[in-house]
Amino acid sequence: ATQDSFLSVVLKYRCQILFTTRSNLNEYCTFQLKEIQDINILFQLTSAFYSEADKYRSTVEKIIETVHYHTFAVELAAKLLENGISTPGQLLAKLQEERASLDNEDKIKIIKDGQSSKATYYSHIHTLFSLYALSRKQQDIMCNLCFLPYTGISARIFTKWLELPTLNEINDLIETGFVQTTTRHTISLHPMIKEIALSETKPSVSSCHILLDSLQKICLMHGIEVDYYKKLFQTAGNIIELIEKDDIPKYLLFLENVFPYMDNYNYQKGMKAIIQELKYFLKRKDIGTDSDRALLLDFQATLEIKPEKAIKLEKDALAQIENITADNARLVSNLHANLGGLYRMNGHPDLAREHMEKSISLLDQFNLLHINDSIPQIANYAMFLTEQQEPERGISELQKLSGIIKEYHSDDCLDYAKVQETLGTIYLMTANLPQAKTHFKRAFKIYEKIWADEPEMIEAKYQEIQELYPQVGFFLGQQLSDFLTKQT
């Protein structure tokens, strides 16, 4: 897919060996030369251009690490030290501060691909990778690729995120060397290329709105899980760290929509990052709404391990909203449900019932009973009813909920599994072990499928059940363990 017009001319010379960074020639025998990772070899390269390299060896090695072992960048840094006025320590500090956007006026001469030129370090890096030669569409793709995790992601998934009609543009970037790929069609950016793309394209909320919208859509598809959720969360984390926040309302909405999906998988690293980001922006009174501030307090309560502190946070969240409207009824309902759940955990059944029933009544009042938020609310309410010696009511509510989930989503999603687990728990609490086993098996079959690559999550769920009910936990756990080992 390369656009190099002279490639066909070069091939006519019948070369025995052709060195190129521009094309992927599948019809020929090829050998891939990768970056040199040996620090000693790269130090020798530095010494060839910088006469005092031995004197400052430790600093020079840190410079090599900072430019990600890229031979051309190492050579540039060495020549800058030999001919410029910067000391190794000053250059290292500048590199660590600005990385690929180094603004150094010292002119250096270098030969690359047969051409001699003078430029600053910054200009040389950009000349090497030819970012200016990319089409506008390719620059947009590079801009969004900056957020991918270091391990990369499926090219087809990324194409869907950007709503690209074909893989052609990405394939072109792969052939020119800007995008790395593996045999499994995973794409990523070399760290140095990523830094150049960041400094050149300056990704922002506005320019990357398609990507942000796509990630939010996935997070809002309640009951539908994706097997690449960890890479999705890592991408969101990179967005938080790297993107220019030029549209604050849209950015806050992105954070608020991603957090619950992370909570679904207990991805605390990302949840904590979102909370810190929201706290940073919402400390200013001219940014955000009452609902934004209520959500921040609710998110903080989610990660708070002390019940009394979590209760205070939820009460403070409710206090942020003075008037309940159609726009905020869903949020207020969730806050009441969360507060009711905390009161239940902290041994206040009357307050728990009050807030749980308030949350469900708000959903009913504003015609919201069909939405996904009703799932955890009804499940928790059913558990509460069982604890209050009303298990039949709780089981009835959950059976209705199972039917709704199966009708509107499926019977192999995480929501369905959670309801089955809750049913199993209620039957266990009422000493109906055969029914408990049936529902736990249904739940664990789904957990095993969704968490196939993370057996520790299945084990944690099993341990959770054992710890809650030690009197029957070993017996049930052994049955579940036998059941799981028989799954294929």
Task: List PLM regions with ranges.
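A eukaryote-biased feature capturing mid-to-C-terminal, repeat/solenoid-rich segments of large proteins
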Residues: 84-104, 136-139, 198-224, 228
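Extended alpha-helical scaffolding segments used for macromolecular assembly and cargo binding
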Residues: 207-288, 292-294, 309
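A conserved switch/coupling segment of P-loop NTPase cores
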Residues: 1-50
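Conserved alpha-helical positions within TPR/SEL1-like repeat arrays
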Residues: 256-263, 291-305, 330-345, 356, ...
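C-terminal boundary/linker of central alpha/beta nucleotide-binding cores
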Residues: 75-82, 125-201, 208-213
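Loop-to-helix "switch" segment enriched in basic
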Residues: 42, 80-138
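Amphipathic alpha-helical segments of the small helical/lid subdomains adjacent to P-loop NTPase cores
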Residues: 33-76, 90, 168
